[in-house]
Amino acid sequence: WIDRVLAERAYEVIFVDDGSKDNSWEIIEQLHAADPERVVGIRFSRNYGKSAGLQKGFEAARGRIVVTLDADLQDSPEEILDMERLILEEGYDLVSGWKKKRHDPLSKTIPTRLYNAATRWVSGIALHDFNCGLKAYRLEVVKAIEVQGEMHRYIPILAKDAGFNRIGEQVVQHQSRKYGT
């Protein structure tokens, strides 16, 4: 899917296996063996959490634009090109996905809306969906921030604190979760 979307571009895919118990690592190894120039695998011995996975991916990233995408297939790689355009043509440092129409239960949607409103108010960053895993960054942004603990939820704030003030958002499609929890 990513290969189809980015077919005519130079890109790399960095997979971070955060201590999965299924056959994720074997699949990553197969993908790397088939395309060692484009596919990088990082494996954790146990589950360290999303922030640690993002940090290791950011450390390994080499491309001019870095895109984060969760493996649960709720977000579509089809969105990458529009986000890339906002960075390259509109001058954004970071573009966050906004799941405007969510396919989650109310038990998740209501707390998410409250969290986003509070975070928007406290940070002064006009985003609707701080926690969307689909984001695009200039390489300089991911190299300037350090994501620890549960700080993946606050990456736009970390970026702003590091001097990257051009933060925008892109409405993205949201699918029901296919994998993971």
Label each PLM-derived region with a short phrase:
Residues R9-S20, I42-R43:
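Short beta-strand/loop segment that forms part of the nucleotide-sugar
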